[in-house]
């Protein structure tokens, strides 16, 4: 139904008249020093792609790149932060993939579903449309804090 050519937040595959699968992958480098917080932020970011399409997440896979010298406690904290956000979203984490990399990165591949008639697309917005923000972006708060100092 939707692929990369539409620039939407996730790919959508119509399974039948009442169900479409929604799939996304998102990861980035740390924007905070605390590993648990980093896991929470990265997971929320990946999950937001599913929610942006009007879908409900079901399952997620971890994507973790970390220098082995940082130790397993850092990896565990990142993964626990991610798992916490996934559980809060009503989904679960089922494995994933880790690699040794000098530059830390974390994110998720998330699978969800939506009624194909209720998909929210990123095209079609017009000047004058109302935009509801339900939370303040943590990224924006951190940027503001950085600019203040």
Q: For the regions a protein language model found, what residue spans apply to each?
A:
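Conserved small/polar residues in nucleotide/adenosyl-binding loops
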Residues: 139-149
